[in-house]
């Protein structure tokens, strides 16, 4: 994902076996600060099939993302409605070394979280959640080692490439269908937002060397806003990936291959590609829904959903609660819309009601 790519491209010291970094920087592959990604490299000997060789470089990465109930900021739950600067939304983790060659840097993390302009309210909870994410990564790494041991490195890598190639071809078939329906005429949609901004998108199909591709151009979208409805670039790209994946009628794993036939144009400094340190917390949960609606509207396949994530949050220094409330989904050419469901960005389950009773 975007966070792994950002870490790989960073100037940080190279990964070592046993390392895990954590990151939530919206301007470096992230979404908003409560979403913290743990990234663990997987080192496998190049000739591991024969049982010899040295582990000198990571061949795979495993990652897990968790939405933390609180990461600091001016309100409990780290979803302030009136933030205007990123620091008001919580503590920044920009490829922080959580585990250094097997050693958990718990005190260093605690100090880092405490020195934010608006510190986290319950660091023990954050640390416990991060340990759970690390455990998930470790399980993923174990399964990768098991696969390589059973099938061999070359076979595993070949199938990983096949999964991406298959996803690319599946999306190209979707583009072919769009081309047959609309030709090369731009598919355009504009979605106004309650904050006064608007999202403009134009989707154009092109043919080069008998291969079809699509350009998704957000030129004309409003400039970044003084509020927190700005959406980081990764959020916009994720919405494009999501929409085109839903148009594929075969069960394929979601992966980067889906993006290969797609060219995404997002002007610098606009609502969907803001400049640091603009606030972004609502961009991930509100603007992302509007981006999705604009894409479905341009393609003519789905009416708009409720267009919001309906965030509900409260708390104090001891407890923090965060919930999303469901709404309606749009109709399509051959089916009706629905009510009281989670749509698009959320697709989440309800929190146990016992949490409210605490």
PLM segments and residue spans:
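Glycine/proline-enriched, intrinsically flexible loops and inter-domain linkers
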Residues: 1-47, 53, 57-358
């Amino acid at each position: 994902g975007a966070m792994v790519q950002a870490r790989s491209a960073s100037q940080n010291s190279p990964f070592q076996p046993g390392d895990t970094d954590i990151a939530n920087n919206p301007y470096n592959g992230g979404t908003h600060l409560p979403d913290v990604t743990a990234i663990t490299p997987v080192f496998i000997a190049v000739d591991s099939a024969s049982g010899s060789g040295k582990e000198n470089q990571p061949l795979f990465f495993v990652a897990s993302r968790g939405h933390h109930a609180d990461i600091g900021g001016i309100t409990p739950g780290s979803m302030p409605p009136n933030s205007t600067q990123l620091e008001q939304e919580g503590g920044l983790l920009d490829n922080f070394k959580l585990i250094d060659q097997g050693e958990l840097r718990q005190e260093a993390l605690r100090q880092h979280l405490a020195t934010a302009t608006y510190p986290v309210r319950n660091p023990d909870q954050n640390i416990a959640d991060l340990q759970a994410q690390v455990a998930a990564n470790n399980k993923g790494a174990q399964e990768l080692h098991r696969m390589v041991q059973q099938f061999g490195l070359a076979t595993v890598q070949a199938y990983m490439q096949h999964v991406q190639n298959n996803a690319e071809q599946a999306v190209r078939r979707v583009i072919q269908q769009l081309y047959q329906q609309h030709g090369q005429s731009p598919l355009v949609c504009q979605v106004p937002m309650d904050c006064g901004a608007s999202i403009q998108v134009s989707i154009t199909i092109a043919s080069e060397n008998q291969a079809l591709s699509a350009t998704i151009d957000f030129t004309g979208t409003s400039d970044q806003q003084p509020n927190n409805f700005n959406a980081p670039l990764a959020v916009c790209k994720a919405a494009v990936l999501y929409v085109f994946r839903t148009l594929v009628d075969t069960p394929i794993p979601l992966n980067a291959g889906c993006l290969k036939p797609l060219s995404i144009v997002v002007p610098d400094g606009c609502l969907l590609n803001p400049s640091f340190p603009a606030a972004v917390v609502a961009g991930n949960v509100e603007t992302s829904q509007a981006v999705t609606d604009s894409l479905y509207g341009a393609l003519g396949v789905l009416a708009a959903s409720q267009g919001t994530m309906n965030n509900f949050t409260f708390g104090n220094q001891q407890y923090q609660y965060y919930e999303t409330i469901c709404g309606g989904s749009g109709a399509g050419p051959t089916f009706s819309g629905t009510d009281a469901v989670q749509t698009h960005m959320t697709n989440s389950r309800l929190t146990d009601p016992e949490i409210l009773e605490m």
